[in-house]
């Protein structure tokens, strides 16, 4: 199966089928037939439906990343994330019905939910990068998971937002990002407090050891 044209056909076929049927009912033979490829060719490129979904999400990532405005660098981290994530909702717009079907299926299928969470977390790492926020290491993973939670909560609003300007989605996204910003600030304050306590405890511990040694008592 040639790339990337045929892969695009498979992705579009999956999203079309998900819009027409419950996602649980979409089978690999149905997908191959809709995409106009053989089942063997489908297997050559994908492990299953979730892999095709991951390809769709990757395409959305690429579209959002390609459209990032350099002027965003002048805005606050929250404002940059708002712009990036809202662009992401706009990129998803043609497939809203399909996404609704997938979300419903994930609520019934914990395995699907876990696989999607992994894919979305990776995607959110790229969205953080697009907003100029580090997504590497343990802190980066924490940020990506947190942003994934924000994304999931706002998506519930977006799926039912019929306003052309997505006013409810914008309001929900702004609210959730402000909440996340407060959590990050609280965590940073806690980290500073712990570091200060650690530094102040070291001299006291050293003094205790010196006193014990002077008295001939091992610690």
Task: Pin down the residues of each PLM region.
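Inter-helical turn/loop segments and adjacent helix faces that build the functional surface
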Residues: 133-138, 157-167
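C-terminal peripheral helix-coil segments that are non-catalytic and often amphipathic
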Residues: 160-219
């Amino acid at each position: 199966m040639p790339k990337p044209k045929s892969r695009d056909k498979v992705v579009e076929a999956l999203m079309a089928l998900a819009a027409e049927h419950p996602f649980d009912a979409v089978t690999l033979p149905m997908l191959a037939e809709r995409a106009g490829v053989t089942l063997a060719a489908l297997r050559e490129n994908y492990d299953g439906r979730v892999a095709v979904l991951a390809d769709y999400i990757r395409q959305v990532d690429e579209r959002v990343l390609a459209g990032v405005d350099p002027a965003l660098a002048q805005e606050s981290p929250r404002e940059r994330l708002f712009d990036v994530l809202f662009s992401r909702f706009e990129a998803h717009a043609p497939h809203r019905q399909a996404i609704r079907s997938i979300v419903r299926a994930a609520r019934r299928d914990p395995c699907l939910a876990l696989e999607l969470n992994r894919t979305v977390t990776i995607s959110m790492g790229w969205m953080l990068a697009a907003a100029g926020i580090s997504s590497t290491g343990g802190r980066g993973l924490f940020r990506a998971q947190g942003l994934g939670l924000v994304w999931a909560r706002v998506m519930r609003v977006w799926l039912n937002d019929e306003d052309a300007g997505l006013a409810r989605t914008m309001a929900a996204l702004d609210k959730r990002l402000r909440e996340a910003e407060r959590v990050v600030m609280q965590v940073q304050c806690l980290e500073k407090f712990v570091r200060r306590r650690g530094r102040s405890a070291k001299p006291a511990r050293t003094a205790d050891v010196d006193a014990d040694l002077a008295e001939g008592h091992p610690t």
